[in-house]
C-alpha cells in the first residue's frame, strides 16, 4: 500500500510558468530506469542546472532559492504536466519531495498519473491561483495547509475549496494504488481462481 494522504502542511514554492510540460519536469535522457526512485535529482534538470550533468545549480531558478529549500507544495500555472504521457513526471516530483501541486488546470494524463503516485493535484480558479502567487511572493517561506478530507487549502487568512473525484479521494486517503485496490479483493480473486479448471490456472 502507498502512504495515506489526508492532510499536509508544507512550504510553498511558486513556479510562475504556464504549460510546463513533462519534458521540462523530467527530461527524456533520464527515463531509462523503471523504478520510481532517483528521479528527484533530475527534476526540472534543464532549468535547475546550468550544465547537462546537473552539477552546477542555476541561481536564477526558483527551486534553487534558499527560502524554498524543502518545499513540498508546488504552485504553478495552467496546463501543468502537458506533453508526452510519461509517469516519470509525478515520480520525479514526489521523489524530490512534493506532495501537492496547485494549478488552475492539468493535462489529463498527468492528472491521473498523479493520483496513482500519491501526488495531490489541486485545481483552483485562475483568480484564486493569482491570489496565491501574490501571497507567496509577498511572504516567502509561507506554508499552506492542504486538507484532502475537507477538500480545502488554507493559505494565510483565506480558505480555498477544491473538488476531487470521490473514488480518487478515497484511494489517496487510504493509500490505495492499483495494486492496493487489487489486494482488497484478494480473497474473491482466489475463490474465483479455485473454481476454474486446472488448465486455465
Swiss-Prot record:
Enzyme Commission number(s) of this protein: 4.2.1.33
One GO process term, biological-process aspect: L-leucine biosynthetic process
Catalytic activity: (2R,3S)-3-isopropylmalate = (2S)-2-isopropylmalate
Pfam family of the protein (one): Aconitase_C
CDD domains to which the protein is assigned, alphabetical: IPMI_Swivel
HAMAP family: LeuD_type1
Database matches in PANTHER family: 3-ISOPROPYLMALATE DEHYDRATASE SMALL SUBUNIT (PTHR43345:SF5), 3-ISOPROPYLMALATE DEHYDRATASE SMALL SUBUNIT 2-RELATED-RELATED (PTHR43345)
UniProt-listed NCBIfam families: leuD (TIGR00171), PRK01641.1 (NF002458)
Protein name: 3-isopropylmalate dehydratase small subunit
High-level lineage: Bacteria, Pseudomonadati, Pseudomonadota, Gammaproteobacteria, Enterobacterales
Gene name of the record: leuD
